[in-house]
């Protein structure tokens, strides 16, 4: 017998805790490089660095920043119960740093011809939050 749906259902959404000091520093306009140095686990700081580099045409730099934030985010997700699948909603502010890193990683990968990585990142975004599929 074949079933076309998951009988166990979808796992609960993973909601990362914020990093208040890093979040406050970024909100106050502190240079994201300073924030990343002081709070290296803060994906939001890495996302800001990656976005700035990508906007400035520095694709390899953007790729490196985004990959760092992506890995820091994966570590945080796992520490908070994520098993490699399930919702990571954009609507929860502390999740956005990780999701922004995945977005920039996909864009930078596409620019350097890493089609497989672009596709994996795009699928991860869809899996984390279907509203990010566009």
Can you describe what each PLM-predicted range is?
Residues 43, 92-95, 99:
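Start-of-helix signal in alpha-solenoid helical-repeat scaffolds, especially tetratricopeptide repeats
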Residues 1-84, 102, 107-134:
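N-terminal alpha-helical interaction modules that lie
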């Amino acid at each position: 017998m074949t079933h076309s749906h998951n009988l166990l259902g979808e796992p609960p959404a993973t909601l990362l805790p914020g990093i208040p000091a890093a979040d406050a520093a970024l909100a106050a306009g502190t240079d994201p490089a300073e924030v990343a140095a002081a709070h290296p686990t803060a994906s939001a700081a890495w996302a800001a660095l990656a976005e700035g580099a990508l906007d400035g045409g520095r694709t390899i730099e953007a790729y490196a920043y985004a990959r760092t934030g992506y890995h820091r985010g994966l570590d945080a997700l796992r520490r908070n119960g994520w098993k490699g699948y399930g919702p990571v909603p954009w609507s929860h502010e502390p999740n956005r740093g990780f999701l922004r890193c995945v977005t920039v990683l996909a864009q930078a990968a596409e620019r350097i011809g890493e089609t497989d990585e672009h596709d994996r990142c795009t699928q991860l975004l869809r899996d984390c939050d279907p509203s990010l599929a566009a």
